[in-house]
Amino acid sequence: MKNASALPMNDQLATPATVLRIDRFTCPLAHWLAFAERLAFIDGHLRSHPHCRMSRVASSERDGQVYVITIAEWDSRDALLAAKQEMAAVYAENGFDPAAFLSQHGIESEFTTFETMVL
């Protein structure tokens, strides 16, 4: 009888596993344009990064809020970590503090990293 479990066996993990960075934001509509500009800036850098396989931004507006998710797929966890350091340097060069920006604009955020798998 075949294994009926919906969970993968160890040999079913994607090889090599890619990494998904999925971020969620809730942005007050009044600050959406400023936030959208930052998202476009970041997305432009990600799309040109040699180890970023895919970058997408999606949004939904309701009740005076804009709900946003960003999804980026990376070759590896090391590639993601290196890209985060590169972006931190770009932010520093431009005098941009992401945490302060989010706080000043009342934007709530959640950042999560997942490893891909084959089911």
What spans do the regions from the language model cover?
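A short acidic, often aromatic-flanked loop/helix-cap motif at beta-alpha or helix-coil junctions
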Residues: 63-64, 114-119
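Short, surface-exposed ligand-recognition loops at beta-strand->loop->(often short) alpha-helix junctions
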Residues: 26-37
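Short, well-ordered beta-strand segments in beta-rich or mixed alpha/beta enzyme
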Residues: 19-26, 55-87
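Short amphipathic
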Residues: 22-24, 111-115
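Residues that cap or initiate secondary-structure elements
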Residues: 29-31, 78, 117
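An amphipathic, aromatic/His-enriched active-site/gating alpha helix that lines ligand/cofactor pockets
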Residues: 2-4, 14, 41-53, 73-110, ...
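Low-complexity intrinsically disordered segments
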Residues: 6, 67, 109-113
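Short beta-strand/turn micro-motifs at beta-sheet edges
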Residues: 7-13, 56-59
